[in-house]
């Protein structure tokens, strides 16, 4: 059964446009409360990023929960993985994240964690969707849900992040620039790295409700690259708006993406005898990652794009490490979802163990040229099912003669078709990608 409201990572869209409206979010809160109250008493945690609309949707969702009889614990601004962690530690039935991740401020969304801190199973999402289409009822006044605030939520999560590295860890002498995307990590990330001894320069840590991800964060690295060089820093770390993606910059200003970071962590875990199984990537993972892991005899498999699918594959195989080139990295030995701060700490530990700079350590992986072009589309028709697009994809694949990959996929969070071509020669890869993107664009017009 297909899902009506849920995408690959909750429900997301433009603020004020269905379903990202106060009335829908109130009904959603009620539906979530009703779904989890079927199992008995229900407590739900709510956290959010720094968008101005987050306050409106927090109030609406909280009202819906109360109407269902479920209790609410408010966390305030908190990285997505922090909400997953606190949902587990407070033994809540569910955690709610009000965020649109790396999207601009005029988007927002709602995503969920189970009581174990993992993404909701499909059957629970379908139950919530059924309730959304049912008439809303309100419990009697004596049974309305209560609301309270967890005042030390940030401190708890800071200590959890620090506990992901050995207690003897000291980054004294390490100069780091952090780009907090004016998002949910703006207070927490600087505290974590400073308390572990690093010398920290902070960018984009003054959220005003409208500047989240605005020319900053993991999808806009220009400012971080310049700052690392200007401050003669050892490296730079960029988070996205809700703190579940991380990208890094070496001391020369060169970008180190999620595939490279995943390799550095995997190699360190293997060298220290801590790697369990192999590594899970996605269909978008660079071929160079697969080849580099192959050289180390580390198994590698690809999941569908989306950290929920990476996590599902990890659980199915009982492996501990996976991620995406966008910077979602899941370290199951520490957490149950992509955690940007913890992933960054694991990379710093890998550098410390080898006594290398980030620029030196990344030489262990040679990425294949890869070009990704996003094509926006409207309407209900699936452009990937159009004969012209299918024929072009087959033709380009044949032209590459087995020396590359073509991947066309729709984004699970935005109305985009992602055109990805990968091969051994950059000019031909770019030409093939532009050729495919042009055909997809014509079909979408």
Curated annotation (Swiss-Prot):
Q: Which GO terms describe its molecular function?
A: magnesium ion binding; phosphoglucomutase activity; phosphoglucosamine mutase activity; phosphomannomutase activity
Q: Which Pfam families match?
A: PGM_PMM_I, PGM_PMM_II, PGM_PMM_III, PGM_PMM_IV
Q: Where is the active site?
A: 101 (phosphoserine intermediate)
Q: Does the keyword Magnesium apply?
A: yes
Stated EC number for the protein is 5.4.2.10
Q: How is the cofactor bound?
A: Binds 1 Mg(2+) ion per subunit.
Keywords from the UniProt entry: Isomerase, Magnesium, Metal-binding, Phosphoprotein
Give any Gene Ontology cellular component.
cytosol
Q: Which GO terms describe its biological process?
A: carbohydrate metabolic process; peptidoglycan biosynthetic process; UDP-N-acetylglucosamine biosynthetic process
Task of the protein? Catalyzes the conversion of glucosamine-6-phosphate to glucosamine-1-phosphate.
Q: Which HAMAP family match?
A: GlmM_B (MF_01554_B)
Could you tell me which PANTHER family the record lists for this protein? PHOSPHOGLUCOMUTASE (ALPHA-D-GLUCOSE-1,6-BISPHOSPHATE-DEPENDENT) (PTHR42946:SF1), PHOSPHOHEXOSE MUTASE (PTHR42946)
- State the NCBIfam families in the record: glmM, PRK10887.1
| Designated name of the protein | Phosphoglucosamine mutase
